[in-house]
């Protein structure tokens, strides 16, 4: 076997007949498979042991030679080589075809490669190949045109006219093969290059296409006649198996049927040729053979597919590769693995952050080999077999051994769908009783798991390296931050939030208020014995907490706090300030002075002078975690999170908060608000009936009225709410529910959506406490049903988007430290009209500067060039009033096949500079795809007014951007830079004309009458600026402006969609994706290079080709940038393996074979496919020193010779 990890590259070419013969171990002559009585393969059949190898290890067919000692012997009786049965997966056979047959991929694909090579139309080819017409091969001295078609009748007439043998014309694949042999590649290419100089329009396009194919043949060394087969390879029998079912029947692969048809027809043709049968019969047989081979290679590509029993189309060789069930996606990109299991998950509140509970019976099965090894080592059993029996019997001693084995042996837990890399994390197993896996509650958010019946899979990393990687890189305690935005992903939720909220509440006049305690223990004792309440404000000696970072004026004093806050601060990391108020000032700058007693001051006096603080909510806990992470990194943070979790659970249990119907308040003035709304609606309808407004206006006014009524109820609800109400506490703390849930319980349900997505005018006036009427209930079902279907559709759409994103960016890896580029990206805050989508501070964090940043007023240098901008630095730059900064960006990175560390910045998942080898492309794809399900599906209608202002939003808009489609509601853009001098309206054509005066001339733009204008007369506009509202078409922008403008525009557009839905994504992720869409250029004029006009190629390859020419003093080629959608960009990748496993498998492989493409295995997918370690992370060459180095070689210091006698005498003495 070839060692896969030593592969340099992989090439695919057309197979020549001699190549096929060299693969083959013998010819398959009979269509038989297995003898149904003896169940032995038939001789010379499709499963023949002589050709393909023995069916049993080390045993020939007749049984003369058995055992491994005869290895390599060929049996003299049955002719079978004694070897492993595994060779039946590797050895191929062949069929000698009695007539040439065309390969359907090259004849039928689009464009038809055969047609382009011969300059014949696919229709003409089809007529010749399927024996409907003759083609003139050599006209000799007759006036016939070469390659012209003749019908049967014309052929006979011409023969009579010019005499037999006066010209050569044939039909069938044989004729095509003769024509292909006659193609003189060099001459044709030279001729086409000449033609290109003058041709234009359709003619030019056709010439470029032909030149492309002929050039591919010329460069790759493939011969065009190999597109016609004279010999057909037969794939190994174990790849098209035949298995016996229970009833004695056989289940066989469809390929066997297809091969059988080919062999039958081939043998019949051979017989007919022997018998010198009439031409028409032979022709018909040849045509049938052609169709049989077509069906074998790609069934259904031409004509109706050949069907098996139950009219099911048979699966041909092409179908074996295509689609989700094909070889690529089913068996190569993802495989089922051993040492795995799955079970339902349950909550494990007592686990540490890095632990998971594994049921005993699951663990013993997963770790069986390890346990068996230990049993033998401890000599409880003599050999492995006995050890295995011991485990299977369930001997008492195995449990202790299991405990030892799993210590420090991490396992991986995965929950489907794995939307981002946090969907697989490593834990240390803890043995538990029961049958459910136990999961730590804080990692649920990363997995998006809950305990309503979710299942998870568990995997065991086997090798030492795999265990080390799981422990160091994948341990759950390490994944505090979300890779998409760098915010903590392990924030407490639900009960934990509620417990800490209740704990940190304050209340005036509760029992024990004003007591003073010497330390925490005394305060807790008072609380436990009922002398002080959790919420009562008490004093504590500051000196009892010496490790806290007190200011000097605060030491040795008494501080006012609550018993709950003493407990809350007790679990905080020691260097964090004592938290009194849920705000950032207290967290970063220290405890405010107002809580400390001056000497001799009365504590009650201080308490009365203080406001009651609001408790700590979910958001505040998130900020505390982020700050903890910033200061102390992962280990301390995960320990702190466990303490926070335990405290939260403990106190939410103690608080005993419950919800009953009485907890839902009644709004006193609900009737008044609703009556007023009814009255207003009546007025609007009256105005409409009088003709004072249009129906659209009336609809908008009515819906607005009801919306305002609902908001008025909501406002009243908030004003009158009791902070001690359990529902209010849940909502306010962020544990569960929000104001809109609350207002549906206590206010009114409000307006509902109709099935068509339009808002209905009749609102639901009741709330859930009062209960809905039958009609109201019916109205509310429309929206609910639409919500369910939308979610289902959205999930599939979002998953497919993620797949395309991963595919286009999978080979983007951090490849070097610094690419040394001199370009940068000028960034400012992203705004949408007046609203800021993303602030400059957010955009600067974690990036490197390109130029130094100076204070706009004082001119002092805030930060030098090529420096990392930290969170504090970003704040400092923005506070100084800087509005734009030039940073290093993925857009301008000069690294080939990836990005450099400086252009990327920090790794958001760790908060440190990114490492070389990080697969940033895949992470970017996951970060953009994972929130896809949260985006809405709908297209917004602006209040039913003119439809051309409809804006696509949510998921469809993201797809529109990444696929570079023409947007709906497209904006008109200007091509000239200058001033808007006039906007004139033309009522007759219902359009407006916008005139822009530039330096070189006047631009005139026609805009629809209903479009909303973005510019006014006198405005200064830049090239590519939008004149009307709407989305700009990116391809058009690329023509008018440059690549960087398009990249910046696309980045801003993606961010607008996500931010509007409250999803934060780091800019760099979008940058990685957009850069992949613009990595190709199209050659316009080849100059002196040997590039072909119209070719799509990578920018780096193009610059290389030009570099050589410029050095030698020639004319360089010119090109223009191309914007490709992600699907197209994936298929245009340089790796044919990656493209073939994505979509359009046969087309990609056909093209790659003709070009003799080499896959240099740079990306992740192609390496996974061939089973090589991926070139990212620890798999990068720089981290894997494959050549063994003797680490502790014996050092020879001095070479001394000693005689034997000398030694013995020395010992004797």
Swiss-Prot record:
Keywords, comma-separated and alphabetical: DNA-directed RNA polymerase, Magnesium, Metal-binding, Nucleotidyltransferase, Transcription, Transferase, Zinc
Q: Which residues does Mg(2+) bind?
A: 450, 452, 454
Q: List the disulfide bonds.
A: none
EC number in record: 2.7.7.6
> Reaction(s) catalyzed by this protein?
RNA(n) + a ribonucleoside 5'-triphosphate = RNA(n+1) + diphosphate
Could you say which protein family the record assigns here? Belongs to the RNA polymerase beta' chain family.
Listed under subunit, the entry gives:
The RNAP catalytic core consists of 2 alpha, 1 beta, 1 beta' and 1 omega subunit. When a sigma factor is associated with the core the holoenzyme is formed, which can initiate transcription.
Cited PANTHER family: DNA-DIRECTED RNA POLYMERASE, DNA-DIRECTED RNA POLYMERASE SUBUNIT BETA
Which protein is depicted? DNA-directed RNA polymerase subunit beta'
Q: Which gene encodes it?
A: rpoC
